[in-house]
């Protein structure tokens, strides 16, 4: 059962985002990017208040995703990535992104905190950061 509302076009949009942000990190990395996106829609907290849909989340400015500025983001959605997007919309969570709202790719080690948000772990090149349950209970 879906944890957020998502039309078929929303699924394709999320699949394109997941591929564009993390294709080099494999399916697991793409699922983690999807977790962050779904959490931003679910959360209604911190930087993501009033983000109520996948398009709102993908195109949020400021605070959105770098991939939307790249031409490869606008390529046709592929079935493989749409299936991954459907999995995260249906509630599949992958550590360290299970409760994360942010990720970035540092040049070195992951910092313990990033803008006062705790590091939940690293997967390949990306570090993930989550709010506290008190600050953002809907992502827990």
Which ranges hold each PLM region?
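Bacterial extracytoplasmic/cell-wall-associated proteins, especially those involved in peptidoglycan
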Residues: 2-140
């Amino acid at each position: 059962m879906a944890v957020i509302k998502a039309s078929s076009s929303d699924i394709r949009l999320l699949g394109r985002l997941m591929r564009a942000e993390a294709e080099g990190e494999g399916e697991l990395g793409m699922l983690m990017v999807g977790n962050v996106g779904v959490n931003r829609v679910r959360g209604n907290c911190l930087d993501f208040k009033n983000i109520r849909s996948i398009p709102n989340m993908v195109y949020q400015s400021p605070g959105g995703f770098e991939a939307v500025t790249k031409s490869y983001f606008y390529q046709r959605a592929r079935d493989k990535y749409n299936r991954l997007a459907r999995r995260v919309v249906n509630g599949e969570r992958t550590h360290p992104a299970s409760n994360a709202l942010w990720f970035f790719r540092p040049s070195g080690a992951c910092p313990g905190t990033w803008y006062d948000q705790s590091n939940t772990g690293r997967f390949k090149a990306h570090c993930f950061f989550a709010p506290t349950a008190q600050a953002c209970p809907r992502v827990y």
